């Protein structure tokens, strides 16, 4: 068998915001980390003592370094990242901070917001919900089969089950590599 990758697609869960300890990098509160899921329509939420208000969202963004800061702009191309401009107000101290926050990508670095000497607000990498590969499979006898392989939805060709195993997670949605597992069990039909 030979497998040609035609296309790779991934559906990701919405991005989320979390607080981390600046010294250890651990999420806060340590025993039960909180997160703010940035689902469509969410404009504010609470993380510990911080009220977070989303001012602008750019789902396909690129970071641009200016003289003294980093900002984000629309970028509909390979390596685009998710970015939000937000304000965080500490409900106890009334300290206010605002900045861009982004999970980054293999091209653009992540951007965190340092809230105080102890705490920063971050957007961790987005988690995959579903990923699949459109492939063309060539068999020894000259057949060509084009289909989509997804996790837990293998493709059966010439007695082989081809499973979607993983992808290049450093590139995320931009992965140009799919990892497959090929399983052949000629005895299986005889058992049943």
Predicted regions and their residues:
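Solvent-exposed, non-transmembrane regions of integral membrane proteins
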Residues: 1-192
